[in-house]
A protein has these predicted regions:
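Non-catalytic cap/lid and distal C-terminal segments of serine-dependent acyl enzymes
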Residues: 1-183
Length: 183
């Protein structure tokens, strides 16, 4: 969409002054939730859908130890290699593609010295998703995980698209995945 923010802190004008989504989520929102809600701020998982799935993957990989479990639904796995990511990254980070690498889940996983989530990462992907081939690239993230020994369960579902019914169908599995890792 036109409001796609990609869960990063912008480096380009006019966005850089106020578009600080990564800082807001990690430095402000999570501590605020832990302070005001009866949750254990040390046992937090992260998940998301589509661009939110990209956010879950990149925030988890950019902030080692902050999130204890990780999952995603149809995430944008290699934004520096797809039109959505190229447009957003150019606008928020500039034309220098090296800056984009810091916000690309596939590149971030390739650069991990060891598997950051030994209990595994769960990703669900619909095979009828019209964005799969051009925008999402889960196969690239899968290869990056395999290269460093990161356990990944990438479930591919025939006849499921990119919509919320897809998420609704498998959200209980993601809740179980996080509960197992966090309890």
């Amino acid at each position: 969409g036109i409001g796609a923010g990609f869960y990063l802190d912008a480096a380009q004008t006019p966005w850089r002054t106020h578009w600080r989504m990564e800082s807001y989520l990690v430095q402000e929102l999570l501590p605020l939730l832990a302070q005001h809600l009866p949750i254990d701020g040390e046992r937090v998982g992260i998940t998301g859908h589509s661009m939110g799935g990209h956010g879950a993957l990149t925030l988890a990989l950019r902030h080692p130890g902050r999130f204890k479990s990780l999952s995603a639904f149809a995430p944008i796995c290699a934004p520096s290699q797809c039109p959505w990511g190229e447009k957003a990254f150019t606008g928020y980070l500039g034309a220098d593609r090296t800056a984009w690498q810091e916000h690309d889940a596939t590149v971030l996983m390739q650069n991990q010295p060891i598997a950051p989530y030994p209990g595994g990462i769960l990703i669900d992907q619909g095979l009828a998703d019209k964005f799969l081939a051009e925008q999402l690239h889960p196969h690239l993230f899968e290869a990056a995980c395999q290269a460093i020994g990161q356990p990944l369960t990438l479930r591919r579902h025939a006849d499921y698209d990119h919509g919320y019914y897809f998420v609704q169908t498998f959200v209980a599995d993601h809740l179980r995945h996080h509960a197992q890792a966090l309890l």
